[in-house]
């Protein structure tokens, strides 16, 4: 059975095998369009910020001598 996927850029059907030169894209053009979208920040991977300013305030990071050696 042949597996096919849709090109992420143009939605054209692409055969998914080791001989598919540009997979998951149908062509070098579609691959470069996608790369340009990432470079211009049209695409982004959502992340949850681990930095919470309120938590730091509660820990005393705003104290002037917090980072001084004891």
Curated annotation (Swiss-Prot):
Family: Belongs to the DNA gyrase inhibitor YacG family.
Biological-process GO terms, alphabetical: regulation of DNA-templated transcription
UniProt-annotated binding residues for Zn(2+): 7, 10, 26, 30
Source organism of this protein record: Shewanella sediminis (strain HAW-EB3)
Keywords per UniProt: Metal-binding, Zinc
Cofactor: Zn(2+)
Species classification: Bacteria, Pseudomonadati, Pseudomonadota, Gammaproteobacteria, Alteromonadales
Quaternary structure, from the entry: Interacts with GyrB.
Annotated function: Inhibits all the catalytic activities of DNA gyrase by preventing its interaction with DNA. Acts by binding directly to the C-terminal domain of GyrB, which probably disrupts DNA binding by the gyrase.
One Pfam family recorded for the sequence: YacG
SUPFAM superfamilies reported for this sequence: Glucocorticoid receptor-like (DNA-binding domain)
HAMAP family (alphabetical): DNA_gyrase_inhibitor_YacG (MF_00649)
The keyword Metal-binding is annotated on this UniProt entry: yes
Cofactor binding annotation: Binds 1 zinc ion.
Name recorded for this polypeptide: DNA gyrase inhibitor YacG
One Gene Ontology term of the molecular function aspect: DNA topoisomerase type II (double strand cut, ATP-hydrolyzing) inhibitor activity
Thylakoid is among the record's keywords: no
